[in-house]
Amino acid sequence: MQVDADLRPILGPQLVRLDPMRVKQLQDPIVYEAIDNLAKLSAHCLQLRTPLTTCEKLINSDSTLYLSWKYDEEEKVSRLMGFAKVGRKKLFLYDSQMQTYEGEILCLLDFYVHFSCQRQGVGQQILDYMFSQEHTEPYQLALDNPSVTLLGFMSQKYGLIKPVWQNTNFVVFEELFLALSAENGIEKPPPDGWRRPMTPRRLGTGMTDTRWLQHAVSGHQSKGNAMAAPVDADMTPQGALSNRAHQAKARKAHILSSKPLW
């Protein structure tokens, strides 16, 4: 993405971290337009109607943009080569054994390298710089609805070959869950603030299996005192519809029997 201006006084180094405050302080329409146009190319590659990244969205969010650019001394132009947008989100994740984890994790929300700069190491330079600034390891990163190309990139550059898809379209890697337990005597640190809930929820093929603790509410028709306690509630689709119909009739009867307020 070419800009007919010298952006060195505005952006500074060729790898730059732009948090919302820094983006707002730029106050340069040329830079704003260049970043927005680069984000439009990213959206076009993903076949999206609207771009995921704009300077306006960055200013009004908690996301951070890592931008790679350079100044061409011969042609006297600046070139924006690529970017990565990241942000921290609280996620509920499931490993391959359907055990649940929750916590705040760094998410890659948008990632793009200009077609004229691809296969030149620009993408890895951006992510390596981002990892160093965010104090995060590659296996601790979550990907927001990644493309096959991005998954292949993470596999080739960082050796992350076992993606675990989530029902929220986020993807994490198996190493994230292995970090919570010692494997072969080597323990990797999990992301800050991560923990495994005491009542994990398992999502299968349309069914939700919840394991309750010993001190679960007694007497509740769908909660027992012991783990794996039998459930006597009618959980079939027909039963659920019948329960909702009965509740609707009860509410209607209550409304009709109530005294008017006027």
Swiss-Prot record:
Origin, by domain of life?
A: Eukaryota
Q: What is one GO biological process annotated to this record?
A: regulation of microtubule cytoskeleton organization
List the PROSITE patterns hit by this protein, alphabetically: GNAT_ATAT
Q: Is-annotated flag, keyword Nucleotide-binding?
A: no
EC category name: transferase
Q: So what does this thing catalyse?
A: L-lysyl-[alpha-tubulin] + acetyl-CoA = N(6)-acetyl-L-lysyl-[alpha-tubulin] + CoA + H(+)
Query: Which keywords belong to this entry?
Result: Acyltransferase, Transferase
Which Pfam families has this protein been placed in?
Acetyltransf_16 (PF05301)
Identify the residues that bind acetyl-CoA. Answer: F111, Y112, V113, H114, F115, S116, C117, Q118, R119, Q120, G121, V122, G123, Q124
Tissue specificity statement from the Swiss-Prot or TrEMBL entry: Expressed solely in touch receptor neurons.
Kindly state one GO CC term assigned in the UniProt record. Answer: microtubule
Per UniProt, residues of the N-acetyltransferase domain are 1-177
Question: What HAMAP family does the record point to?
Answer: mec17
PANTHER family tied to this protein: ALPHA-TUBULIN N-ACETYLTRANSFERASE 1
Protein name as it appears in the record: Alpha-tubulin N-acetyltransferase 1
Source organism per UniProt: Caenorhabditis elegans
